[in-house]
A protein has these predicted regions:
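Transmembrane helices of ABC transporter permease
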Residues: 11, 15-25, 62-66, 133-187, ...
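Transmembrane helix-loop-helix hairpins at lipid-water interfaces of multipass membrane proteins
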Residues: 16-76, 153-158, 269-273
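Helix-loop-helix
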Residues: 46, 52-54, 151-165, 239-308, ...
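Helix-loop junctions and hydrophobic alpha-helical segments within the transmembrane domains
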Residues: 96, 100, 209, 310, ...
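Conserved catalytic Walker-motif region of ABC-type ATPase nucleotide-binding domains
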Residues: 100, 222, 338-340
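ABC-type nucleotide-binding domain
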Residues: 329-589
Length: 589
């Protein structure tokens, strides 16, 4: 973990060295002033008026130059030091985001978006505050503490040693308290993630919350999460309070030692009064960096807790990766074949399976180039999972899936997914314009290409009727558009992508009849000349398919045309009668 953290300093090494030099100069100047004052008081200022007045000009020039240098160094440390930290934070954030993008669906199934956002935002801010400040504080404070002690030892060894013993005892106590603070800050980080996750979940589902009038339920859930965070924060501040109080006791004890032991040494003639005054000045210089280090414990502990959480993500090996030397997928015809495929979810969720058998159980399915095949069957039977395995959103546990004879595990994920277009029931539109959302299918597409895709998706007339046209903002998740409009925007971006293979996963199930008719026409146009897999619970929308496969318990139990399956009188025929003969309402996933 330390090696990874230090690697972020490498690109900023020039700034780091300059920042370190400025920190050294700051510490040296702070150490120099008390000893300069001691020498002046014990030497020059004991001479006559003439000698003092002649030297004051030179002293003034020297002090002005010294503190002008200090001012310049302080500016550099404050400005460029923070710039260095900000650049490191930016690189860490990019690395974390890139790592998130490498993960398969399984990772996002197990982790909440609120927790992931907390790692990218809250944790990284604390990490980079420490990345800049902690080295600076260690250098400045370390030199001032050690330098002060060395100077104090040359002035009064007995008094300096007494201070060292007391400081060592307190250091052991504070180190133990520091370990306790690390646990508290780590727990606090988890509680922050809990609040972010709960907040994100509630806000994203606010329309559902209001439709059920469950605002009070969500308030209760949020307050419970907030109370846990408050309790954690109270524990954190308690630990910090004990820590800072211990420091306060240390500085008080040191001053008592200086007054009592120093006074005794003066009385014994072993210490001059001017030296005791200098000693008092250095005590302040000795304690101030100690206080800085104590106060930095919060920043340091937050950074440690945050970087551990970041390191957990960066150290996680993506479960789906390209093979070394993987070639790009070359789709010539678009033939798809599932051969003896088995798959089960690592964490079984509602509808994914019962945990006792694979979701996909030795499935065999061949799809000819340009063929449209529809998958039907009961909820949890494995239809959506079958489609998710083709673009390698999940990897098969056994068997193989190939496109034009190429195993999907042997080609690059990028080329594989670029060859597959996906239109789902739950369309996700980004918070941008309609044009930007369509162009997502082909980044860098021209305005003419975007307009042509919209025309083919039967949404160009609607877009052009809007005052802002293609520059109309759709809102978060497309909230300003209707369900049918969102579906056609999604279809338009797949037209723009122009893939050889198409997956339609219940693309019309949530639409009214009028919207469904318009979207269905667009989908049929999209599917022409492409190998297409359709999942639909409205059997009327798949009668045009070349073949229909019934999937139950992760296997294809029957396959044929609409007419063939009806004549066979099997599972498909039973579902068809349920829908169209009014036997009873039955929905298929």
């Amino acid at each position: 973990m330390l090696k990874r953290f230090l690697s972020y300093y490498k690109p900023q090494m020039g700034l780091f060295v300059a920042d370190t030099i400025c920190a050294l100069v700051l510490a040296a100047i702070d150490l120099a002033f008390p000893i300069i004052l001691r020498n002046l008081c014990g030497g020059l200022f004991t001479q006559g008026q003439t000698a003092i007045m002649q030297a004051l000009g030179m002293i003034a020039v020297g002090l002005v130059l010294m503190y002008a240098t200090r001012c310049a160094c302080r500016y550099f440390v404050s400005y460029w030091g923070h710039v260095m930290g900000a650049r490191m934070e930016s690189k860490m954030r990019e690395d974390l985001f890139d790592q998130y993008e490498r993960f398969s669906f399984a990772y996002f199934d197990r982790n909440s978006s609120g927790d992931m956002m907390s790692r990218v935002v809250n944790d990284l801010f604390d990490i980079c505050e420490a990345a800049h400040h902690v080295p600076e504080w260690i250098i400045i404070c370390g030199i001032e503490i050690i330098g002060s002690f060395v100077i104090l030892f040359t002035i009064a060894p007995v008094l300096a040693l007494a201070m060292a013993v007391v400081t060592a005892v307190f250091a052991v106590i504070m180190f133990w308290q520091n370990m306790r603070m690390r646990e508290v800050f780590s727990d606090n980080r988890k509680k922050i993630s809990g609040i972010n996750a709960q907040l994100q979940d509630s806000l994203a589902g606010m329309r559902v919350v209001k439709s059920f009038a469950n605002e009070q339920t969500e308030r209760s859930k949020f307050r419970a999460s907030n109370d846990r965070y408050l309790s954690s924060k109270e524990n954190m501040y308690h630990a910090m309070g004990v820590y800072t109080a211990t420091y306060g006791l240390l500085s008080g004890v040191l001053y008592v030692i200086v007054v009592l032991l120093g006074g005794w040494l003066v009385a014994q003639g072993q210490l001059q009064a001017v030296d005791m005054a200098t000693f008092a000045l250095y005590i302040s210089l000795f304690c101030t960096p100690l206080e800085t280090l104590v106060n930095s414990a919060e920043t340091y502990q937050k950074a440690i807790a945050g970087f551990k959480r970041m390191d957990e993500v960066l150290s996680t090996v993506p479960d789906i990766q390209d093979k070394p030397g993987a070639a790009d997928l070359q789709v010539t015809a678009g033939a798809v074949e599932y051969r003896d495929v088995c798959f089960s979810y690592e964490d079984v969720e509602l509808g994914a399976g019962d945990g006792t058998r694979p979701v996909i159980d030795h499935m065999d399915l061949s799809i000819k180039p340009g063929q449209t095949i529809a998958l039907v069957g009961p909820s949890g039977g494995g239809k959506s999972t079958t489609c998710s395995l083709l673009p390698r959103f999940y990897d098969v546990a056994a068997g193989s899936i190939s496109i034009d004879g190429q195993d999907v595990r042997d080609v690059t994920q990028r080329s594989l997914r670029q060859s597959i277009g996906l239109v789902q029931q739950d369309v996700y539109l980004f918070d941008g314009t309609i044009g930007e959302n369509i162009a997502y299918g082909k980044p860098g597409a021209t305005a003419e290409e975007i307009a042509e895709a919209a025309h083919r998706a039967n949404i160009d007339a609607f877009i052009e009727s809007l005052p802002q046209g293609y520059d109309t903002v759709v809102g978060e998740r497309g909230s300003r558009l209707s369900g049918g409009q969102k579906q056609r925007v999604a279809i338009a971006r797949v037209f723009l992508k122009n893939p050889k293979i198409l997956i339609l996963d219940e693309a019309t199930s949530a639409l009214d009849n009028e919207s469904e008719e318009a979207v269905q026409e667009s989908l049929e146009r999209l599917a022409r000349g492409r190998t297409t897999i359709i999942i639909a619970h409205r059997l009327s929308t798949i009668k045009h398919a070349d073949e229909i496969a019934t999937v139950e318990h992760g296997r294809v139990v029957e396959r044929g045309t609409h007419e063939e399956l009806l004549a066979r009188g099997g599972t498909y025929a039973r579902y068809y009668r349920m829908q169209f003969e009014g036997a009873r309402a039955h929905e298929l996933d």
